[in-house]
């Protein structure tokens, strides 16, 4: 056992140098990314980084879901802080996902059930993802007057492109496996009973150099790879659609704020884009809409 917490453990698998990071929230039916779990992910990632034999990491869940998102019961206290204080807290948490993303080996997530909000944000920090045909992924934060704050807007823009990323963030709708695969958010889909083996097979191929996992990671560290005209067109379309939506819901600014921030972040590297996301999250968390919807 490389690491044992109350929400996460890291165990060695039979193949030398391969470890499994398991989300298994003690005494609960689901996994959530509460403060304890994020802190344990920090410790687990450090343990993996310090392991000299490390060659690859499988990420899985023992629950019927992968991770359903953050623990909204923690939001009240957090959102009573000032916007700069909220931003600082988000930035501190984001260090965990950056550290996991920057492990020097391939990482593959087996998405067995719902991966929502922070659950999807954790998954897209890995190199590669295999998704069960029975699973769904998404970023539903807009339904709480928010938007993703753990790097979701940054990584989705670079994996799926800004148009689809804006659509996912602004709608908050869960997406099935076929849609996630077509969007480029996951790399493969599998029947539930074959998910683990397909994830292990993909990890083995990545470790053998047959899958360029490093290129998959690098694209999330650089600005969005689109010609300027295409980039501008994507955001003009997204902002027009959101302007129409805001006529129907004028007191819910989260989607518009997210798209405007994603537009600015698209030409930034990872660090710059994450900083913009964290700053905007601090601002949206202090809006009347967010305070009303997370109560």
Please provide the spans of the model-predicted regions.
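Glycine-rich beta-to-alpha active-site loop
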Residues: 94, 98-144, 148, 168
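Hydrophobic, secondary-structure "cap" segments at the distal end of domains
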Residues: 153-163
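Conserved CoA-thioester-binding segment of acyl-CoA-metabolizing enzymes
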Residues: 1-60, 84, 98
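Amphipathic alpha-helical segments at domain termini/boundaries
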Residues: 1-24, 29, 121, 125, ...
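Glycine- (often His-adjacent) and acidic-residue-rich active-site loop
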Residues: 61-96, 115, 143-146
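Long amphipathic alpha-helix in the N-terminal Rossmann-like dinucleotide-binding domain
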Residues: 275, 279-291
């Amino acid at each position: 056992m490389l690491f044992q917490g109350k929400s996460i453990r890291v165990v060695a698998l039979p193949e030398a140098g391969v470890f499994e990071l398991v989300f298994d929230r003690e005494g609960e039916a689901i996994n959530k990314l509460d403060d304890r779990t994020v802190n344990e992910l920090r410790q687990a990632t450090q343990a993996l980084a310090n392991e000299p034999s490390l060659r690859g990491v499988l990420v899985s869940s023992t629950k019927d879901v992968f991770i359903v998102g953050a623990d909204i019961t923690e939001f009240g206290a957090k959102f009573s802080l000032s916007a700069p204080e909220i931003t600082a807290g988000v930035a501190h948490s984001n260090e965990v996902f950056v550290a996991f993303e920057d492990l020097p080996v391939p990482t593959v997530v087996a998405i067995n059930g719902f991966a929502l909000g922070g659950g999807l944000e954790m998954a897209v920090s890995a190199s590669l993802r295999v998704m069960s045909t029975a699973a769904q992924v998404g970023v539903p934060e807009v339904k709480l007057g928010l938007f993703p704050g753990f790097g979701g807007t940054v990584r989705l823009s670079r994996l799926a492109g800004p148009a689809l990323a804006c659509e996912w963030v602004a709608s908050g709708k869960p997406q099935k496996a076929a849609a996630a695969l077509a969007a480029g958010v996951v790399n493969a889909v599998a029947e539930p009973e074959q998910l683990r083996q397909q994830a292990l097979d993909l990890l083995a191929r990545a470790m053998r150099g047959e899958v360029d996992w490093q290129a998959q990671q690098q694209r999330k560290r650089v600005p969005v790879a689109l010609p300027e005209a295409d980039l501008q067109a994507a955001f003009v379309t997204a902002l027009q659609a959101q302007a129409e939506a805001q006529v129907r819901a004028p007191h819910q600014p989260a989607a518009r704020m997210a798209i405007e921030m994603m537009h600015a972040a698209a030409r930034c590297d990872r660090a710059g884009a994450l900083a913009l996301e964290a700053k905007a999250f601090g601002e949206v968390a202090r809006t009347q809409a967010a305070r009303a919807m997370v109560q």
